[in-house]
Amino acid sequence: YFQAACPYIPGGVNTPVRAFQSVHRDAPIFAKKAKGAYLWDEDENRYLDYICSWGPMILGHNPEFVLQGVQEAILSGSSFGLPTKGEVELAKLLVKTVPCIETVRLTTSGTEATMSAVRLARAYTKRNKIIKFEGCYHGHSDALLVKSGSGLLTQGFQDSNGIPHSIFEDTVTLPFGDIEQVISMLQSQKIACIIVEPIPANMGVIESQKEFLQSLREETIKYGTLLIFDEVISGFRVALGGAQEYFGITPDLCTLGK
C-alpha cells in the first residue's frame, strides 16, 4: 500500500511523522481497523497500539459509550456551520477545568490554535518577536516551524524550507531549559510571547523542570511578555487541568487538542 500511495501522495503519507523513518521502518503501517488497545493493518497483522492516533484515543479505540454518543449526535446532523449548544457546554467545562482559561475559541487543528494564540499575543502586546524552544513542536505554521522537532526532521528535510526569511526572522529559537538565554533575550528585545510545551513530546516526552517553567512565568510578567503553554499533547493527561495544574503554574494563554 505504501508503494501504491507514493505516486499520488507526496512521500506516501499525509504527515511526516507517519512515515515511521524515526523507528527505522522501510514503510509505514497502513491501518485497517482497531478495537480497544489493538490495531490491525491491511495485511491483518495485529499490533498493541501505543500511538493512539497521536493522542486522541486515550480511552482506546471504539469504546461503546463513545460510539453511542457519536451515533446519537450524527442523527441530528453532521455539520451546520452555525453555533451549537454543545460548543457552549464544552467551553463552560474547559473554563471550569483548566486554570488559565477564562474564555474559549474553538479551532479545527492544533496548528490553527497555536497560530491564533501567537497572533493574539502580538496584537495584545503590539510586538512582533516571539520565543520558542528547540525541539518543541507547535504545528506547521510558518512562524513556528523552526527547529521544531517534528517528523520533518526524520525525513531528511530542514524544517524551515519554503519559509521566507522575513517570516521566521521574528521567531527566536532558544535551547530548551536555558533560562539565562531567555532572560538575555527579554532584556534586549521586545518579545510578544514565549510559547512552550510544558512537557515536550516531540523530543522524547521530556518532563520539564518546574523551576524553568516558574522562571518563565516570573520573567514574562516582569517584561510584559505573554506566556503560552502549548498543551495540545499534555492537556487532560498529566492532570485534568493539564501540565499547568500539575506544575501549579498558570500561563496567560494555552492551546489544547487531541
Range-by-range predicted roles:
Residues Y1-K33, L174:
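Active-site-adjacent loop/helix segments that line or gate small-molecule/cofactor pockets in enzymes
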Residues P28-D49:
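Active-site and channel-lining beta-strand-loop segments
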Residues R46-N128:
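Glycine-rich loop-to-alpha-helix module at the N-terminal edge of alpha/beta enzyme cores
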Residues A123-L145:
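Conserved PLP-anchoring active-site segment centered on the Schiff-base-forming lysine
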Residues Y137-I199, E207:
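PLP-dependent aminotransferase-class I/II
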Residues I206-A239:
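Catalytic PLP-binding core of fold-type I/II PLP enzymes
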Residues Q244-K258:
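Conserved active-site segment immediately N-terminal to the catalytic lysine
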